C-alpha cells in the first residue's frame, strides 16, 4: 500500500481540503458561530431589568415594571435604509462604492411585565423589536453571496476568487485579526526570577465555560523563608496561608487537608508542607478562617457576620469559578487546589520542569467570534443601563413606557461600527482601556497580500519590549504557524501567519463529553476516597478535574473511536500524559489544529482506492474525516503522537526487522504545508538562507499584479495593476490554492548574472530599454478622490458646482477650467497637479450683512484637486447619494513605465533598483541572438546564499524548452543534478552558462554568463512617488524652520549625524549656512551688559532688565535658539548671550 501512496496522492487530498474549506474558513466559522449561538447566550445571561417607582405619601402600592429579553433574530440579506425611508437589499459592491456599511438588522422579542405585591398584573410580549444592526462578514452564511456560483458573483460585480472573511464598514473593507492569548483554566508553574520573596509560583486564570466574564486569577507562591505556601485570591488584599484557605472551605483536620494534596507517602513533599501546616495551626475553625479572608477583602467597618457571608460568597464565585460557582463545589475545589500545590511542589523539587509560556498548546486565538461576543456583551450592558434609566424616568413622570422608544438601537449599531471602523475594541467612552488595531483595513495590494492578511495572528504585547522569547520560533509552531512569514523590526515574531492547512477550533460544549466520560466509568471526585487517587489517572475536561479512571488505555481508545466516528466533534483534542498520569480532553475555542493522516500498524488507513474515489468526486474532504482516514490534532495532542514525515519512513519501519521498532500513529500529509500563504509562493525555499524567505514574504505583499478580477468596477483609494502579469515558469504546488496562477504578480524575465559596465553595483540592475518599450513591467496606477455634499448648518447645504472667481471667496490657486457645470470633471480628461476634479462650495454666514431674521450667506471654495506631484487621465466618475446627500468619487489612472530608480525583486528577496536602462543593441547577446531583459550583479549571490534563485533559473530554462511548468515545491526531492541532466539533453551547458557577445563591441566575452528565465516582481516603491527637492517654501509656525514631507513641499532634514560629519570635516562656514542661513536665521537685539533679549530698532533701543538704553547689539541667531531662550526664561532660567570684545 505504501508504495502505492505517492506525493500526487497527497496533493489530491490537499486539493479536496481547499475545495471544501478555502483559506479563510476559520474566520467564517467563527462569525457564524457568534451569530448562531453566542449572541443568544449573551442575551440569556443578562438579568431581568426591574424598575420601581419611589414610594409616595398616601399611595401604599409601588408600581414595578420588569422587562426581559427573549429570542434575537438576524435578518438576511443585509439591508440599507435610504434617506426617503425605503429599505433596499444592499450588495457588497454597492456598499463599497457608496461608502455604506454592509450590515443586517437585528430584532429581539421583549416581554414587559407590570408587577404588584401579589404577582404579575399585566404581561405583554412585543415581538421583533428593532435592536440595531450587525455588520455581516462577507461569504458567511448570513451574506447575500453565500453559496452563489461564479457566474452569479460576476453578475453582482464581485471577484469569483475573493474568499470573503472581512466586513464592509463605511465603504472600507475591514478584517478582524486573530488575537493570541494564554489559555485560561490551565495551571502554569514558573520559577520566580531572583531576588524575590518567593522561589516558585503557580497560577491559573479561571473563566467559566459559558460566561465571558473577566478571568479570576488565583496564584500560589512558595515563599523563600519560611518555606510556607501562600495563596493570593481575587479581591483579597493579602495572601492567605494555604491551610487557612482549606479550613475556610470546610476541611479542618491537618490529615484531611494533606489527603487532598498528597496521595502517597512522599517524604520530600511532606517536608515542604511542614511550614505551611504550622502556619495554619493558629486557625482551627471554619468561621475564623472565613473571617480571616473576610477581614482582608471586606470594606473597613463591616460587621463580622457579614464578613463571613462575604468570604463564603467570594470562595464560591471568585475562587476557581470554572469548577463551579454554586454551593457544594468545595470538595472539587479542595482537590483542585491540592493539584495546584502538587504541581508547585514537583517543580520546586526539580522533578518536573517549569511550564513554557511560549508553548503553542497553551495559547488560544480569539477570532471574530469571541471578539465580537465580548464587544456585544459590553454594548448590550450599555443598552440595558440606558433602558433602565429611560424606564425610571417614565415611571417617575407617570408616562407610559414605550418599548420601541426605550430600546436605543443605535447603541448596538454605533458600537459595532465604531469598533470595526477604528479598530479600538471596546466602549468608545473608555477608549484608553481598549485594545487598538484589532480591526484593520484589508490589504488589497495584490491577491496574496489579501489572503495573507485574512490569516494573520497578532500577539498583543508591547512592541517595545526587548523580550526575545515570545518572538522566537518555537518547536510547537510546526504546521500551525509559518516559520518564514513575519514582519521585520518592531513586530518581528509577534505578528504571525497561519500555515496553509492550520485551522482554528470554534469550540463546542463540554457537557456531552462529561456525560460520555461518566458512562465510561469515570468516578466523580465526590464519590471517591483519597486512597484511590494514587494509582488512578486524573481526567480533565477543559481544565476542570472531573474525576479519575483506572483504565486509561481503554478510555483513550474509546474516546478516539468516538471522535473518528464523528459522535464527538472532530475538533476535540484527547491527550494522554502518561508521565503525569493525566488525560486532558479539550473542546474550547481558539486552539490551532491541523489535519494528519491516520496510521494503524505502521500502515496508512487510507487506500489508493479511496484516493481514486476522491479524484472522481465520489467522496469529499469531509468523508475522509468521517471515515477516520484523517484527523485534526491540536498542538497538545500532536506532542503526544508519533508522526511520520512521509510514507517512505512508514514503509521503512514496517520492513524493519530489528527489535527496536517505532509505532507511528499519524503521518504528515505533506511537509510543505508548514509554510504560510506568502512563503508558499517561493520556489525552493528549502534552498535559501532562512531570513531571505522572511524578506520575500514581506516583499511579495508589495508586488504589483492583479488584486481582484473586478478592479475596473472597484473604487479603491490606491491600486496598481501590472499590464501583462504572467504565471511563473517555475511554480509550487501550493500556488494552485492561492490562485497565484490566475492572479499573478510578476513576469518571467530573461536574467543574466554578470558584471557588465558598472551600472549594476550595490544591488542595482541593468534593464533592457527595448523590452520596456515593448511593455515589460509596465503598470497602471489608480487613485480615487472622494467628496460629499453635507449640511453646513441646518437647512443650508454644500453644493457641487463650478466655482466662479468673482462670486466665491477663498478660491485656491488651482485650475478650475476642466470642470463641467455640475462641478465634476468628465472621464477621459487629461489632468495634472493642481487641476480641480470636484468643485464644491460651502455657504458661510456673512456677519456684516446678516440679521437674526434674515441670514445672508456667502460661499467659500472647498474643492478637491489632484495631488501636486501626480498626473493622469480621469478614468471613472460616479455620482450617487449617501444619507440623502450627493456623493461623488473620481478615479484617476496614470501609466507607470519602469525607469531608473524603480524597485524590482526576484522571489528570493534579491531586490534591486534600476541603475541604467540599455537599448537592445548595447546589451550582451548569445549566439542565438537572445538578449537578457535584466542583468544583475554576481556579488548579490554569495553572501546571501539564495541558492533557490539559481535553481529557479536553471529549472526555468528547462520549463521554457519543455513547455511544462517546473515544480519547485519544497521538500519534494528535486535535485540540481536532475535538472542539469535535463538541461543538457536540450543541448545547453548543463549548469546554465552561456557564451555571450559584448553588445558594445560585438566581441565574444571571455567569461560565460549564467543566463535563464527568472520570475521578477515589480514592487510598489517607484521613483516618481519619492523624487523630491525644494529651494524656498513653507515654514513651520512655531520654529520658523521648513516643514517636513514631500506632500507639503517640505525641506530635507540635516540631522545630528550629518552635523557631526561636517564638524569632523571642519567645514564651519558650510555648517552655519545649512543650520542657520538656509533654515531659520533671525535677527534680534541683545543687551551688551546683561546679555538678555532687548528691544531695538530705528527709534528705540532699550533693555528692560537693566534699564540700559545705549548699548544694545543686533545678533543673528537661529529662530529655534531664540525660542529656546524664551522658553527657559519662562521657567525662571536666564540664558545670557555674551559678546567677545
Swiss-Prot record:
Q: Please provide the Gene Ontology terms (biological process) for this protein.
A: DNA-templated transcription
Q: What is its EC number?
A: 2.7.7.6
The UniProt entry, under PROSITE patterns, shows: RNA_POL_BETA (PS01166)
Gene3D superfamilies (alphabetical): 2.40.50.150, 3.90.1070.20, DNA-directed RNA polymerase, subunit 2, domain 6 (2.40.270.10), RNA polymerase alpha subunit dimerisation domain (3.90.1800.10), RNA polymerase Rpb2, domain 2 (3.90.1110.10)
Q: Where are the zinc fingers (C4-type)?
A: 1087-1106
What reaction is this protein's catalytic activity? RNA(n) + a ribonucleoside 5'-triphosphate = RNA(n+1) + diphosphate
Q: Where in the cell is it found?
A: Nucleus
Question: Which keywords describe this protein according to UniProt?
Answer: DNA-directed RNA polymerase, Magnesium, Metal-binding, Nucleotidyltransferase, Nucleus, Transcription, Transferase, Zinc, Zinc-finger
GO MF assignments: DNA binding; DNA-directed RNA polymerase activity; ribonucleoside binding; zinc ion binding
A family per Pfam: RNA_pol_Rpb2_6
Q: Which GO terms describe its cellular component?
A: DNA-directed RNA polymerase complex; mitochondrion; nucleus
Membrane spanning residue stretches = none
Q: Say yes or no: keyword Nucleus present.
A: yes
| Binding annotation for Mg(2+) | 763
Sequence positions that bind Zn(2+): 1087, 1090, 1103, 1106
Domain of life of the organism encoding this protein: Eukaryota
Q: What else is known?
A: The binding of ribonucleoside triphosphate to the RNA polymerase II transcribing complex probably involves a two-step mechanism. The initial binding seems to occur at the entry (E) site and involves a magnesium ion coordinated by three conserved aspartate residues of the two largest RNA Pol II subunits.
Complex and partners? Component of the RNA polymerase II (Pol II) complex consisting of 12 subunits.
Task performed by this protein? DNA-dependent RNA polymerase catalyzes the transcription of DNA into RNA using the four ribonucleoside triphosphates as substrates. Second largest component of RNA polymerase II which synthesizes mRNA precursors and many functional non-coding RNAs. Proposed to contribute to the polymerase catalytic activity and forms the polymerase active center together with the largest subunit. Pol II is the central component of the basal RNA polymerase II transcription machinery. It is composed of mobile elements that move relative to each other.
Q: What NCBIfam families does this protein's entry cite?
A: PRK09606.1
The UniProt similarity line reads: Belongs to the RNA polymerase beta chain family.
Q: What is this protein called?
A: DNA-directed RNA polymerase II subunit RPB2
Which organism does this record belong to?
A: Encephalitozoon cuniculi (strain GB-M1) (Microsporidian parasite)
